[in-house]
């Protein structure tokens, strides 16, 4: 019965707590423990002021941007920075390129301009951030090996989900 249900799956979307951030290499291998959404990273106040507008979701020590600065400090500027839902999407795809807009607000993504803040675009680690896609966008087809491992059709589409709070409203 479960295999029959799995064979009917056509698309998957992940929702997750938007602030949890992890560092991984280009193959998606985590470099260490994720920094949870509730963890504040102290000592980055001046950098945050230079990178993002004050009062925005990325401007505090408890935002993902502060966690990104901490992870970059520990693991270096060549590590990928991914929120948990974006990392899981990468695991399904075998490709850690993509990020979903809502999950990246606290990292500095601007929903109105559909871009990173200008000061952030000048950082040497900008290319370590995900390419952002809107919620509901198709990111790609599940990796063949992952489909086999999970007993899913090999044409399942992986779709950008949303944050846990947005999903709760839906």
Task: Label every PLM stretch briefly.
Residues 1-32, 77-79, 126, 147-160:
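N-terminal glycine/serine-rich phosphate-binding loop of ATP-dependent small-molecule kinases
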Residues 1-8, 45-51, 58:
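N-terminal phosphate-binding loop and adjacent alpha-helix
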Residues 12, 39, 71:
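Residue-level signal for inorganic ion chemistry
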Residues 28-41, 104-108:
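A charged helix-plus-loop insertion that forms the helical arch/lid used to bind
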Residues 35-53:
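Short alpha-helix plus adjacent loop in nuclease-associated cores
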Residues 53-165:
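Gly/Ser/Thr-rich active-site cleft segment
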Residues 168-170:
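Thiamine diphosphate
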């Amino acid at each position: 019965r479960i295999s029959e249900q799995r064979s009917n799956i056509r698309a998957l979307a992940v929702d997750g707590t938007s602030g949890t951030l992890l560092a991984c290499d280009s193959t998606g291998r985590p470099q260490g423990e994720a920094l949870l959404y509730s963890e504040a990273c102290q000592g980055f106040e001046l950098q945050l002021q230079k990178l993002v507008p004050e009062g925005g979701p990325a401007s505090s020590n408890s935002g993902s941007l502060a966690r990104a600065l901490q992870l970059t400090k520990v693991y270096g500027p060549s590590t990928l920075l991914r929120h948990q839902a974006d990392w899981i999407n990468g695991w399904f795809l075998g490709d850690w390129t993509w990020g979903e807009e809502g999950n990246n607000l606290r990292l500095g993504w601007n929903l109105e301009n559909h871009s990173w803040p200008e000061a952030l675009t000048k950082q040497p680690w900008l290319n370590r951030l995900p390419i952002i896609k809107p919620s509901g966008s198709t990111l790609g087809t599940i990796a063949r090996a992952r489909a086999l491992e999970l007993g899913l059709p090999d044409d399942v589409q992986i779709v950008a989900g949303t944050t846990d709070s947005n999903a709760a409203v839906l």
